[in-house]
Amino acid sequence: MNVFWFIPTHGDSRYLGTAEGARAADYDYFRQVAVAADTLGYDGVLLPTGRSCEDAWVVASSLIPATKRLKFLVAIRPGLSSPGLSARMASTFDRLSDGRLLINVVTGGDSAELEGDGLFADHDTRYAITDDFLHIWRGLLAESHENGGIDFDGEHLSAKGGKLLYPPVQRPHPPLWFGGSSPAAHAIAADHIDTYLSWGEPPAAVEKKIADIRARAAARGREIKFGIRLHVIVRETQEEAWRDADRLISRLDDDTIARAQQAFAKMDSEGQRRMAALHGGKRGSRQELEIYPNLWAGVGLVRGGAGTALVGNPEQIAARMREYAALGIETFILSGYPHLEESYRFAELVFPLVKGGGNTRRAGPLSGPFGEVVGNQYLPKASQS
């Protein structure tokens, strides 16, 4: 089981929908979260993309020297940048990080934002552009440096003599990750993608998506891995966890929720539509927002994209993760508020249950975790409870 964390380049806070308890989205904080994820034993981090956050490539590049083993899941944007430029960026990053790059293919589901960036295309056309883009991008990274270049004549994008002089460390190219819930998205996944990502829907819905993509990929002679994107609120007791879930949305008012839901409703993203359907745009009771045992839809009231959280004590969180893993999920991309503190909580409380230990760094005999020395003489004992 692989566990990733998240770099909150769109800001961080103790509460949703208010400036109260907010933290500056600056390099010092991004570095703190990245170093914590690296030293705690997370396998990688996701960096978000879009106008609501700092540029993922610039931030990820700045974090390479601050980390040792952490992988970076960074977005390429078909239709917003050329496949040639994106291929060179990916190869350089992979070389400078010694093979620590993972690629998140983001077609985009907010037509207003995309038009603001200069892309005027409907939903299915955007996925057709993505298909052309990935044919060229993969060819450039996999083979163009070994021959005279690649040619591709697509419906929307073409290349003639495309060549990449500096190959990536990971061959044939850094692994491709991708999420999308529409039939057009599933077709892209089956044709091109190494790991398909689902947002945190109930297990039955995730299982259905996995089955469809597996069947499509098998028909093309391919196998695909699967991951899931979730928030997490883990505490020593379930009562504490649910209390903090309620606290996270305690500053939300009806107007803030309504404005967020109106913005989401204008998108043509099938995944966003499915997220919104889980809570109906209304702030309800815990029972109404707990859409499956320990799966809470409160985050999606005002946050776009991943809108559900696993909430509970360590054993409950681990049980839900194993339930998803039984469906074929290999990678969990998690986040929590505030991201620095929650990264420690999850690693300390849940890693021993799902990864076989807490801090997975190679360390000397006196490296922790062991807590503060007792009486200036003794290392503290392990819990007897």
From Swiss-Prot:
Gene3D superfamilies: Luciferase-like domain (3.20.20.30)
Database matches in CDD domains: Alkanesulfonate_monoxygenase (cd01094)
Protein's UniProt name: Alkanesulfonate monooxygenase
Family, similarity comment: Belongs to the SsuD family.
HAMAP family, sorted: Alkanesulf_monooxygen (MF_01229)
Enzyme class label: oxidoreductase
Assigned keywords, A-Z: Flavoprotein, FMN, Monooxygenase, Oxidoreductase
